[in-house]
Amino acid sequence: MKRIFTWLLIILFANYCLAQITFEPPTEPAKIRALKVSQTINIDGKLDEASWFSAPSITEFIQKDPTQGAPASMSTEAKILYDGDYLYVGAVCKTTNGKSDLRTQNMQRDFSYFQNDLFGIAIDGFLDKRNAMVFQTNPYGTQREILVMDGEIFNREWSGLWSVRTQISDSTWTVEMAIPWNTLRYPPACDKIGVILTRNIRSNNEFVSFPAVPRAFNVYRMPYEAILSGIEPPPPGANVQVIPYALVNNERVSVDGDLTEEKTDLKLGGEVKWVTGPNSVLDFTFNTDFAQADVDRQGGLSK
């Protein structure tokens, strides 16, 4: 009887602990709006166009780690604009001690998620609460992008077409992103998408997001997404991305130090990615160099 009672206590304690690190997605998702712009947005990280001052602010960033549910220790103000070509994302990330608060491991694209300060946005174009395109940057404008499926499957090999610039001051670092609509996937007549905004404050080992996401899950658990409305993207259409490559092989044969034969081979090839519709992509590879080819990636369509 004593043993049964002990096990009951353990189970109750485990359930209590689990309840502290997870919670259900809200029945009414957070709602935010984007501002349509007609002026040219210069992607320089300064956020000094008039449209940025007029756009609604997003400031309710909540800790995921280390203290779930607590306000962020350093404030973040994000805003979203759009026009017929781009979705623009801007953010002002406050710091306590200026540049000394920032941690950046390297300047390589697709940098480490955990070892760098970063700001990012996940976009669920179909509102299926499963799939998302993630765009991130560190304080020095290095890009990182991921495809996320079900909050558990990650394609880190994906490279989307987008641009970003950042600025660092004594009290902030600012982000200005321009994401082409033809990089994103969404249905015809789209007027809203799902988003999760994130920031890693590495000096405090702190990760914050809007909306809040339980620490038991990856931060890109899209059932917790906010709804971004007020958008009028162009109809989704086909676009083509070409990734060429060239390999040069030079062979020399010498006998007793004398060159007797020299041969140079040039090999050309590449990959063509053709987005034929809002939820279909065709990949073509020609003259593949299998020594350089990626292994098969796990992926999924949005529907």
Region spans (language model):
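Bacterial Sec-dependent N-terminal signal peptides
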Residues: 1-26
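Structural preference for beta-rich elements and adjacent junctions enriched in aromatics
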Residues: 20-303
